Design a protein with these regions (language model features):
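Active-site lid/adjacent beta-loop-alpha segment flanking the redox-cofactor pocket in flavoenzymes
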Residues: 226-227, 242-350
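Glycine/proline-enriched, intrinsically flexible loops and inter-domain linkers
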Residues: 389-471
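Dinucleotide-binding Rossmann-like beta1-alpha1 core, especially the glycine-rich loop
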Residues: 59-137, 260-265, 269-271, 406-424, ...
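Helical element adjacent to the flavin cofactor pocket in flavoenzyme catalytic cores
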Residues: 150-208
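Central helical "cap/lid" subdomain
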Residues: 199, 203-252, 382
Length: 471
């Protein structure tokens, strides 16, 4: 059955799945549900597709991660984006460039060796290179202070809006429907146990609801009395004026990352685009993003990012004489551990979460595929436990989320040494003998909000973790 018109088509009153949110992740899920044979599915978006974080994204798609689950997501996304334009007829702007991740310390190279071994077991094409080999891949950089680099061969970038549109088009071609400019105002349960999604244009009754609300996912979750631990964090990226060296360059230019500054850098047209990750980061709209916010930049804070731009210029000297074409600042949703929230929501039947992703373009292909498997087949084909939203219980407060989300952004490029314990927002829950253990030199870790003693420092030994990839 259908009711009022929405986005040029009649709004269905009944569907099997309603996806809330038209960013790249929501559109990817819709696309992959149809690939598994579920075509009675709809997506509801309050504004235009890609009007949230997707609209502001740089479009980088990389396979680097220390997390095996995320590596599978990234790997699949690249495969999908390479093929999507030919399948749907919608341009995605995909470019295979490869990427370099620089190392200026031996600890960083140890990290790369650790990740390299994991990547090779997954069939990811990557290798370690010397400073001289790295310079051949990115000829505009100085190699002073470099120990080496890691090279991922198939990394690249895409047009976020074009890729999202391609996913939406592919889903529509298979029978799904997309309703833009139609905000969800509430959720309720029918006597049958089905969900009723109350939208501005009418109600849709469905079996399953997926919250892919992006920056608004916490507000959607609140409609079913669920607190979703995520916080928008400001992120700048800067485009330089056109550069003659780039204009005359033949072929693609390998993208560049220096995690010890940190920044990412890639070719954009005849120029270079850089995104720094500042330690003095700032949360935005901590009490919830306004429903009418869409496709808008946040105020630029040049003072906050200038030190990173100056360090970039030391690495790529030709940028010292380059002007700035534009600076953009936009919000990215971060969770307490920097990992997204993917899967069923505890205590709310047939309600799934697809939110809190700070690498949305990189991971969207994979999360759409594997969440679709979870919904249709009852379980995903890979282990997604590290992303399961049920890892955060009712102990996760707003103040904890604030502190830990900011920490997650600051430590985005932190050395991924196993057993590293983060400290923000702690302690949350302590056992009765916590004070006694602390007095005895306990060094604590945290699991599911609980403080637990990992080890005890002997007399004369400072009770501090000193972690390394080496013994």
């Amino acid at each position: 059955m259908c009711t009022a018109s929405c986005d040029g088509v009649a709004l269905k009153t009944q569907a099997r799945v309603v996806v809330i949110g038209g960013g790249i992740s929501g559109c990817s899920l819709l696309y992959h549900l149809t690939k598994l044979g579920w075509t009675d599915v709809v997506l509801v978006e309050k504004d235009e597709l890609t009007s949230g974080s997707t609209w502001l994204a740089a479009g980088n798609v990389v396979q680097w991660t220390s997390n095996r689950c995320n590596a599978r997501l990234h790997q699949y996304s690249i495969k999908l984006y390479q093929e999507l334009e030919a399948e749907t007829g919608q341009a995605t702007g995909w470019r295979t460039t490869g990427s370099l991740r620089l190392a200026t310390t031996t600890d960083r190279m140890d990290e790369y060796r650790h990740v390299l071994s994991k990547d090779h077991t997954l069939g990811i094409e990557c290798n370690l290179v010397s400073p001289e080999e790295a310079q051949k891949l990115f000829p505009f950089m100085h190699t002073e202070g470099l120990v080496g680099a890691m090279h991922h061969v198939l990394d690249g970038h895409c047009d976020p809006a074009g890729t999202t549109s391609a996913l939406a088009r592919g889903a529509r071609q298979a029978g799904a429907e997309v309703y833009r400019f139609n905000r969800v105002r509430g959720l309720s349960r029918a006597r049958s146990g089905e969900w009723v999604v109350h939208t501005e244009k009418g109600d849709i009754t469905c079996e399953i609801v997926v919250n892919a609300g992006g920056l608004w996912a916490d507000r959607v979750a609140a409609m079913v009395d669920v607190y979703l631990p995520m916080m928008p964090i400001e992120h700048h990226h800067v485009l330089f004026e056109d550069l003659s060296e780039i204009e005359t360059l033949e072929g693609e230019l390998t993208s560049l990352r220096d995690p010890d500054v940190p920044f990412y850098l890639r070719k954009e047209g005849n120029s270079l685009l850089v995104g720094p990750y500042e330690s003095d980061c700032k949360a935005w709209s901590a009490n919830g993003v306004a429903w009418d916010w869409a496709q808008m930049d946040l105020p630029v804070d040049l003072e906050r990012i200038q030190q990173y731009i100056l360090r970039l210029m030391d690495r790529v000297p030709m940028l010292k004489d380059a002007g700035l074409k534009h600076i953009r600042n936009g919000p990215i949703a971060y969770t307490p551990d920097g990992q997204q929230l993917l899967g069923p929501v505890y205590g709310v039947p047939n309600f799934y979460c697809l939110a809190g992703c700070n690498f949305g373009i990189t991971q969207a292909g994979g999360v759409g595929k594997y969440l679709a498997e979870w919904i249709v087949e009852g379980e995903p084909s890979i282990d997604l436990s590290s992303l399961d939203p049920r890892r955060f219980g009712n102990w996760t407060s707003k103040s904890y989320t604030w502190a830990t989300a900011l920490e997650a952004y600051r430590l985005q490029y932190q050395l991924a040494i196993p057993d590293t314990e983060r400290v923000a927002g702690r302690p949350v829950k302590t056992p009765p003998i916590y004070d006694l253990q602390e007095a005895q030199g306990a060094v604590f870790g945290s699991r599911y909000g609980w403080e637990r003693a990992n080890w005890f420092a002997p007399d004369g030994v400072e009770p501090v973790d000193r972690l390394s990839f080496r013994r």
